[in-house]
């Protein structure tokens, strides 16, 4: 399968294209999509998820397809076999929001799995810029002094030796 997400950041890594959080899937025969209204309705969200920035796909022990989509504003939405099953945000996972935007703005990017099946991600404009959802379902927040409050933190890349590299654009503080 091929996956594609809609939204994200502008060419200067600024926030908000303000596009609906669609996930498009091509299964080598046809395209299909998951409408963000489905996530809003099923997960009782205050708005449609929007501005997806990254996507990570895996399977669980039952061989169900699990998709995580991060967004610039709405945290992370988890899908199981194409159905939204969980929204991760400041209330149940991250414990903090991007400064200056009021309640509920979680700028998440750079989803990547490590060798142990833990899901790593970055979070902009917060004190704990690196977040980990471990394979058991527990959240961990890492405090890296140099990343506190940074305006835009992009991808986290995980190497074959399980090292983590974080991409932070220049001149963005």
Model regions and ranges:
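Carboxylate-rich, polar loop motifs that coordinate divalent cations or form catalytic acidic clusters
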Residues: 1-173
């Amino acid at each position: 399968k091929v996956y594609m997400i809609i939204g994200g950041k502008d060419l200067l890594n600024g926030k908000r294209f303000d596009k609906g959080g669609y996930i498009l899937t091509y299964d080598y025969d046809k395209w299909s999509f998951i409408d963000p209204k489905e996530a809003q309705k099923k997960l009782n969200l205050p708005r449609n998820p929007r501005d997806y920035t990254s996507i990570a796909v895996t399977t669980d022990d039952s061989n169900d397809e699990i998709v995580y989509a991060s967004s610039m504003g709405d945290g992370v939405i988890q899908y199981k076999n194409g159905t939204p099953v969980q929204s991760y945000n400041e209330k149940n996972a991250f414990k903090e929001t991007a400064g200056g935007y009021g309640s509920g703005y979680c700028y998440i990017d750079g989803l990547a799995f490590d060798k142990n099946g833990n899901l790593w991600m970055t979070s902009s404009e917060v004190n704990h810029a690196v977040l980990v959802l471990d394979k058991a379902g527990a959240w961990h927040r890492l405090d890296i002094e140099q990343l506190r409050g940074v305006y835009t933190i992009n991808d986290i890349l995980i190497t074959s030796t399980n090292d983590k590299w974080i991409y932070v654009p220049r001149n963005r503080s």
